[in-house]
């Protein structure tokens, strides 16, 4: 299987550069199992598309203002993108500079203080910050929001709110779990009234999510690592949902990545079952992999040749995904982080468009 198998052509004007005025006003392409017809809806229609007893699972990670700028002793400019916080004053980072900084070198930060390069960590660097407060708190004032590279503008005040989900609470992501951006408090209230239950996982989306696949043969691709937590309470929620015949719907690919990373085969469950898990994942989901943990997912439209295109193709089938994407392009849907969404049912769900 090749990277080019997941290419499609997208007009630049369909890449959303800013959010809509209302989160739930985004369009929603409902993609039931083939051969049922696609349906053009809105995210605010979700209460009509889900049933009492269904379980929506969100990623509650919170985006940190993870982009910093500074200057090396030589005078060269440096851009720092924090990948992961490591204690109060250390972090794993990406560094953009004309020359790679050496261990022991210092970077004077534009926001004040300095950072010492401790060394390399694979494709990343380890930095120790000399700043007055713990890094997590200092970044709230000193850092800049790391909007994705395809958003061709500087982040504004509005992005501090809109590039964050309304249920974000666990600090640590450098990119938003974008499917969750469509949910506002009125929509959540209507879903509760409908009898839909909510659960949460945490997956801290890392800077690796912006990295392209650099090899054409996918069996040579090395997936980036991300930290996640699937708690015992969520596992019990899923068990109860299954027991009563409800459906499990992931809000975003990060939730699917979390649940599949916590899926374990046991003697009692040879096909596997969800179990509590906290730690790093490097799971790479592409066609040939069977996603067992969810019946459906709400997800945005993904970049050509990305690992997320591969994941949704594994879930719904490559031909079905490409038919949906071609429909979305023809109907002028908005793409990527600030764009529209899909309600995607798995090939094996047999659940139609979810309407009751």
Curated annotation (Swiss-Prot):
Catalyzed reactions: 7-aminomethyl-7-carbaguanosine(34) in tRNA + S-adenosyl-L-methionine = epoxyqueuosine(34) in tRNA + adenine + L-methionine + 2 H(+)
EC number: 2.4.99.17
Listed GO CC annotations: cytoplasm
BP terms from Gene Ontology: queuosine biosynthetic process; tRNA wobble guanine modification
Broadest EC class assigned to this enzyme: transferase
Presence of keyword Glycoprotein: no
A Pfam family: Queuosine_synth
Cysteines engaged in disulfide bonds, as pairs: none
Known partners and oligomeric status: Monomer.
Record-stated family: Belongs to the QueA family.
Entries under PANTHER family matching the protein: S-ADENOSYLMETHIONINE:TRNA RIBOSYLTRANSFERASE-ISOMERASE
Name of protein: S-adenosylmethionine:tRNA ribosyltransferase-isomerase
Gene behind this protein: queA
